[in-house]
Amino acid sequence: MRVLVVDDDEIFCRLLAEILEGQGVEAAWTTDGLAGYEMASRHHYDVFIIDVRMPLVLGTELAEALKKDHPFAKIILVSAFADETLLNLCERIGFPVLSKPFSARHLLEAVESILANSVKPEGSNSPR
């Protein structure tokens, strides 16, 4: 499984990558939302973990663009500012939110949950 973490906090990116890699997941990361979009166009990722508040592009905007280009993308948003307005927006656009700080267990459960609820495109037996 491949996961892309997009968050403007490099230490947070490295921490999530370490947690995921400890479970045998191939994790890539970037601190730039636009670079994350570019990485997604060049490589296949099973799950995207995206911070909501980043410079240049909001995580919700990046998530919507990724979903448009990759309809079967599995996306989890993360935020230290997960208020009711954000939670309602994310529910409306269909992305789960993890509120920072969260435990490694909650991260892994969120990834497992989003994959368990996934629908594969017709004719797709394996990732690209």
Q: Where in the sequence are the language-model features?
A:
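Acidic catalytic/metal-coordinating carboxylates
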Residues: D32-A35, V57-L62
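The short loop immediately C-terminal to the conserved phospho-acceptor aspartate in CheY-like receiver
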Residues: D9, V52-R53
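Alpha4 helix (beta4-alpha4-beta5 surface) of REC/receiver domains from two-component response regulators
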Residues: E61, F81-L98, R105, E109
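Short hydrophobic/Thr-rich beta-strand motif most characteristic of the beta2 strand and flanking loop
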Residues: G24-T31, M39
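The feature encodes the CheY-like receiver
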Residues: C13, P55
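Charged docking surfaces used in two-component/phosphorelay signaling
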Residues: R14-G22
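Active-site beta3 strand of CheY-like receiver
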Residues: H44-I49
